[in-house]
Amino acid sequence: STDEGVAFLLEYDNKVYYHAGDLNCWYWKEEPKSYRNNMIQLYIREIQKMDNLKIDVAFVPLDPRLEETAYKGLEIFMEHTNPQIVFPMHCWGKYDIISSFLNTHPEYKEKIRMINNEGQIFNV
């Protein structure tokens, strides 16, 4: 993780699952610029390990607390991997960030699932 914690990539029953845990582009505006730039590079380095990997189901942070840089981690993830289904996480109940992201990135509408409430159930 670029913060604290772990991320998981596993294969089960011929499917690949990725759970980012706390691996994200943690670009906090109150941190020094050198720290923020380092976080971007660390995140890219970790995500590049999965370059072009076909991932069937992914769980990736889309954290509104990051404000204007909230999209950065998911953008980098989508550019470097080939996920089939992505569930944004770390939304802190502010699920409208998913719609906002998709309005900015319509090319991902088929892959990123809309979450409307906690406990929502999906069939994949």
Over which residues does each language-model region extend?
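Core dinuclear metal-dependent hydrolase active-site scaffold
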Residues: 1-54, 119-124
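Active-site neighborhood of phospho(di)ester-bond hydrolases with catalytic His/Asp-centered motifs
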Residues: 18-22, 35-38, 57-65, 84-92, ...
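Binuclear metal-ion centers of metallo-dependent hydrolases, dominated by the metallo-beta-lactamase
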Residues: 49, 70-124
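Active-site-adjacent loop/helix micro-motif of nuclease/hydrolase catalytic cores
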Residues: 29, 68-70
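Active-site glycine- and acidic-residue-rich loops that bind
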Residues: 1-2, 65-67
